[in-house]
Amino acid sequence: MVYDIMDYDIELWDIVKKEINRQERHIDLVASENYISIQAMKAQGSQLTNKYAEGYPGKRYYGGCKYVDLIEQLAIDRAKVLFTAEYVNVQPHSGSQANFSVFNALLDPGDTILGMHLYHGGHLTHGSKVNFSGKLYKTIFYGVDKFGCIDYEQLCFLTERYRPKMIIGGFSAYSGIVDWARMRRIADSVGAYFFVDMAHIAGLVAAGVYPNPIPYAHVVTATTHKTLAGPRGGIILSNGDNDIEFYRKLDASVFPGSQGGPLMHVIAAKAVAFKEAMHVDFKRYQKQVIINSQKMAKEFLNNGFTVVSGIPYNHLFILDLTNHYITGKDASLVLERANIIVNKNCIPNDSHSPFITSGIRIGTAAVTRRGFNDNDVQEVARWICNILNDISNEKIILNAKKNVLDICYRHPVY
């Protein structure tokens, strides 16, 4: 029997090899991406993928679940310790599905939700009209002030005026510190649920280098990739004062409410990632992620670029390219020619569509994972500045690409 994909399916393996090579030879500055460990990859590629296990540990609809019960409970217990949570559900297949489960558990169609506007740093699942959250619920948005910081006065005003049933904290493109306690007080003023999506900062929170929202929110969701550097997937957490009925609602909204059988091989990989995140090396890594983010942002500022929200306090920041007369789309395309990967991103009150944008989002979780230090990322920022200051200059692009290949060779992914 042939066990190796390279021997069985040469056509597929050829494509996979090209992607592996691309990852090794490109600098990944996409804030939502990271590199999973070999150990977690092995768990995800194990025989656990063969097992169907609808239900929860001890309450399955299938036989033969003795060992997958132990694996899921291990993942739950580790996440509880890691995030100081009373309740954890590790079954959501993604962050978006975790968010859907929270909405489905706590809201009725037509209820009002108040979330951060997509252009100001929010996420599609926080009320965008192209997403279920904007189609099933009445959506109101808060944003950032002229300094790029969350406008809490606007948030308070909108809360009093529209009395939402849920206020959403969290973001996909915001680089400041969020005052979770203040947001909870605002939610409490109208009896609203306070729900936090910490998908982007879960690793930072686990390491204790960014404020933990769990003591303040009714419910929190996260992804297990991004800064947590685990497999692609979602989790739901809560410190709901041991409100068993509240936890049951959340569980029922995941299964059977929105999913069938959980992906046991992915849950095993989540368990590995949670163990890794408990190690002292993980905290050092997350500290360096923020150091690298701040170092890059300062380099851009020193070169005349605009950084939305100023110096970042997490792993990401947005470059506003308006004063350089470049769209985010053009910037991302020209940088990719130099083997530097970013994503185009809207800026507050953007005049361009999300397909074009006036900015790019830069994240340091992945490059830090492969060993880039603050001097390395400062160099990378300089190369980006050189390219964006003269995007038609082929010599600059080729020189940057040469430098990228050299630094990637010195810092392999695996």
Curated annotation (Swiss-Prot):
InterPro entries from the UniProt entry: PyrdxlP-dep_Trfase, PyrdxlP-dep_Trfase_major, PyrdxlP-dep_Trfase_small, Ser_HO-MeTrfase, Ser_HO-MeTrfase-like, Ser_HO-MeTrfase_PLP_BS, SHMT-like_dom
GO cellular component, one term: cytosol
Compartment list: Cytoplasm
Pathway info: One-carbon metabolism; tetrahydrofolate interconversion; Amino-acid biosynthesis; glycine biosynthesis; glycine from L-serine: step 1/1
Cofactor: pyridoxal 5'-phosphate
Record: residues binding (6S)-5,6,7,8-tetrahydrofolate: L118, G122, H123, L124, S353, P354, F355
PANTHER family from the UniProt entry: SERINE HYDROXYMETHYLTRANSFERASE
Name this protein carries in UniProt: Serine hydroxymethyltransferase
UniProt organism field: Blochmanniella floridana
Gene this chain is encoded by: glyA
